[in-house]
Amino acid sequence: SFTHSGNRLFFADYQANGYRIASLPADSLLAEKTDFDRPVSMPFVETLAGQEKFNLDSARLEPVDFQPKRYRKGVHTFKIHSWAPFYYDVAEAMNTSASDLSTIVKPGATIMSQNTLNTAIMQAGWYYDKGYHHGKLSFTYQGWFPVVNIAADYGDKAFDMAWAQNDKGQQVTRGYYTGRTYLEAEARIYLPFNLTRNHRIRGIQPAVSYYFTNNRYQEYGSREFHAFQYVLPEILFYNYRRKAQRDILPRNGYQLRLQYLTTPFNKENYGALYAGRLTTYWPGILRNHGLMLRFGYQYQELDGKALYLPKHLLEKPRGYNFQYQTHRQWAFKADYALPIFSPDFSIGSLIYIRRMRANLFYDLSRNQARSKGAWTTQSSFGTDLIFDWNVLRMSYPITTGVRLIQPIDYGKFQVEALFSISF
């Protein structure tokens, strides 16, 4: 392509070491007629051809009789393509690449299946966590509209939460583990309306999820036990600039998610939960740097309700693991991502290291446990040191790294491992 002034032409020049960017002054270009009956002289190509003993033009090709067969979707739903000697949640790993990373690798094993049409994706795995064995199965089918996703996790011990009277005559909840094996299941359907155009990735995605666990909670009035379950309708709007190959975050754009959580089978104990989350992307100080600012607010109805929901829609500040009781909560997160080094280094066919990068972050959360109650603060800061690489010449990029976290209000310095993968 020519420069804006039109006085120089840029083009890709292929050499022995690969492609390189080259340019020529526009006034040096030759305007000559070409005779297509005469082959164009290319010294580099002729040198390579002289080293080869096989000439495709003189090869004798035998005809192949192909017999077409009908492709039956049901028979070809599952096609195992890879496995791992550890466990990780593929869906979680894929969803963290654009906004955050998480510590999701556990001891165990994983197998993954994806059919030829890329409409049926399955993951089955076993993992060991906190002294218990777990079995995990997830399946996504994208051949319909809407997309359907189901997942189940079986392991650990289930518990019951019951009402009891304390020494002061007050009604309080007391939990105890049971002999039941813990079961957690979720079904989700969503409509991926893709409005992408040119360099803007845009879309609207309404969704509804149903969540079930066999942990049981006793209702305050009727004293009946019910398994904890909820319904979560939500809608996602997104519009951001397509990333260049070296970009870590989009240069500009936003994602807006609105959510409403309700427990239709246990309304005596729990009120509805509303949440809104806004993610914005901004250019950094230097090229390929990126700034991500995230804002969130959630509100839980407590009037006439006996318990707080054991579920939050806003993410906790990094470095805090305690689930706070909340009536109202707002959150702010800032991430600044920057590349450190792009070595393009490989060790034979074992590994290929594409890039080393860093992410500086600050998290702040303000929480009010009850109406007219005091507000509490949880905040932290830290950095991520991350490697983007490929292993054994697999086409799936892998992201690994380490996270250093320093809670500000209380808590100790922490170190976490990071993992993510893209398919």
What are these regions (language model features)?
Residues S1-S5, D37-P43, D384:
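Conserved blade-ending motifs and adjacent loop-strand segments that build the rim/top face
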Residues R8-A12:
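Residue position within the beta-strands of beta-propeller blades
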Residues G18, N149-Q205, S209-R223, L293-W330, ...:
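Outer-membrane beta-barrel translocator/channel fold
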Residues P25-F145, N149, G221, H226-R251:
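Outer-membrane beta-barrel initiation region
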Residues H76-K130, I150-D156, V172, Y210-Q218, ...:
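Transmembrane beta-strand segments that form the barrel wall of outer-membrane beta-barrel proteins
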Residues T103-P107, G131-G135, G179-A185, R202, ...:
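Residues that define the transmembrane beta-barrel architecture of outer-membrane proteins
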Residues A109-S113, L137-G143, A152, A185-F193, ...:
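Residues on the lipid-exposed face of transmembrane beta-strands in outer-membrane beta-barrel proteins
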Residues K157, W163-Q165, G175, G221, ...:
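C-terminal outer-membrane beta-barrel translocator/porin domains of Gram-negative envelope proteins
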